[in-house]
Amino acid sequence: SAGAVTLAQAQAFFAEQQAQGAAGVMIKAIGGGGGRGMRAVMNADELPEAHARCMSEAKAAFGVEGVYVGRLMRNARHIEIQVPGDGQAVASLGERECTLQRRFQKLVEIAPSPSLPDALRTSITQAALRMARAAGYRSLGTFEFLVDAESATLPFVFIEANPRLQVEHTVSEAGTGLDLVEQQRAGAAGAPDDSGSATPASSTGSGQ
């Protein structure tokens, strides 16, 4: 959905996705993450309770009760692209894979992803860069996607962008040799971004 939804709107979205063969929908809080205000719904009868619970959890955790809905991708992998920008240009510092999670909390981060085909890696990276350019992005941030490499019609979807460094930025630092904290400090002081010259480590996977 494009924004916060009412129960009626969530139900309409569920019916639309079901007609397209989706397994269900994911309800997610607008105000924050960490698994709070977030539920997968695969049965239309469960939607009213799930919608109400997510709104209640979101209000308690973030002070904002709004939730949105998206297509449920049951076997998706979680891929995030590290993007620096200086307001004029943007670059990619490669991806991290954080599919291994418990209760929607990331347990392991791998950079680069050993499971991502090269063509799909390129498509996802370009999608992240297009969004960053469109926003005139100036910061270090993470553009996150769900990926279903076996799908011929919907191989990946955008989840969210976090316009800040996250704790997992050190994984990207290890792969590029860059000090991203210093990079962000320099950017805040007005220095142009030069991280695009860094080359992320190549994947140990086949990439096929």
Annotated model-derived regions:
Residues 24, 34, 41-208:
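ATP-dependent carboxylate activation and anion-phosphoryl transfer catalytic cores
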Residues 1-30, 35-37:
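A conserved helix-loop-beta module that forms one wall/lid of the active-site cleft
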